[in-house]
Swiss-Prot record:
Keywords: Cytoplasm, DNA-binding, Transcription, Transcription regulation
Keyword Thylakoid annotated: no
Protein's name according to its UniProt entry: Probable transcriptional regulatory protein FTN_1028
Organism: Francisella tularensis subsp. novicida (strain U112)
Subcellular location: Cytoplasm
One of the GO BP terms on file: regulation of DNA-templated transcription
Length: 248
């Protein structure tokens, strides 16, 4: 299991997301709508929808907004008929990147994604070119200061696959993606509120970068995340706290 702390990345990511709150909500609503369309509107029988709702609530989305998105998707609204597309490529320094999109026009989306890679010193790859480096899993991250022993006991009892405590005191709880929402709910019920919780593609081996390359990779990820059709971007870059502080 990878032992890299998510804490520095989370703080950096949250600062960026605060400035893009409207766009983040649009992406979350789209994920809820598509999850409901594909798997039905009952979150108890639809793990993907349950995870999408949990992420939306963690981002302070209102329950009314969430419910409207579920109804729209489950009702088969034609505007919800977008398809999911995944692109893979390499960024500066050979960093592996996965880009998950939802689109009603593949040609538009691939053109925009390719342009972002090319303008940032990377290149779009073929299907499978980097996906083998990643494992899909749930990661629930806690800030330094949480009661490690108590958290470990509750998490393992709830079915967590692994728990990693990092040098900075932060803790990551790893789950099977299908058990993610259930484990998160148990932790919340027991009083353990995470700083971040998501089903993600986690790289077993991280790419170590210097400050200049890290800044270029961050710029590429920002460009990709700003594209309307892009839902999520994953990379194997190891953005350490030291690197983030150097970049500012």
């Amino acid at each position: 299991m990878a032992g890299h702390s998510k804490w520095a990345n989370i703080k950096h990511k949250k600062a960026k997301e605060d400035a893009k709150r409207g766009k983040i909500f649009t992406k979350l609503i789209r994920e809820i709508t598509v999850a409901a369309r594909l798997g039905g509107g009952d979150k108890d029988a639809n793990p993907r929808l349950r995870a999408a709702i949990a992420t939306a609530l963690a981002n302070n989305m209102s329950k009314d907004t969430i419910e409207r998105a579920v109804v729209k998707g489950a009702g088969g609204d034609e505007s919800a008929n977008v398809e999911e597309v995944r692109y893979e490529g390499y960024g500066p320094g050979g960093v592996a990147i996965i880009v998950d999109c939802m689109t009603d026009n593949r040609n538009r989306t691939v053109g925009e994604v390719r342009h972002a890679f090319t303008k940032s010193g990377g290149n779009l790859g073929t299907d499978g070119s980097v996906a083998y480096m990643f494992t899909k899993r749930g990661i629930i991250s806690f800030a330094p200061g949480v009661d490690e022993d108590a958290l470990m006991e509750v998490a393992l009892e709830a079915g967590a696959e692994d728990i990693i405590t990092h040098e900075d005191g932060s803790i990551d709880v790893y789950t099977d993606p299908y058990d993610f929402s259930d484990i998160q709910e148990v932790l919340i019920e027991k009083g353990f509120n995470s700083e971040n919780a998501e089903v993600t593609f986690d790289a077993e081996t991280k790419a170590e970068l210097d400050a200049e390359t890290a800044e270029k990779v961050m710029a590429l990820i920002d460009k990709l995340e700003d594209l309307d059709d892009v839902q999520s971007v994953y990379s194997n870059a190891n953005f350490t706290q030291e690197l983030i502080e150097q970049i500012g």
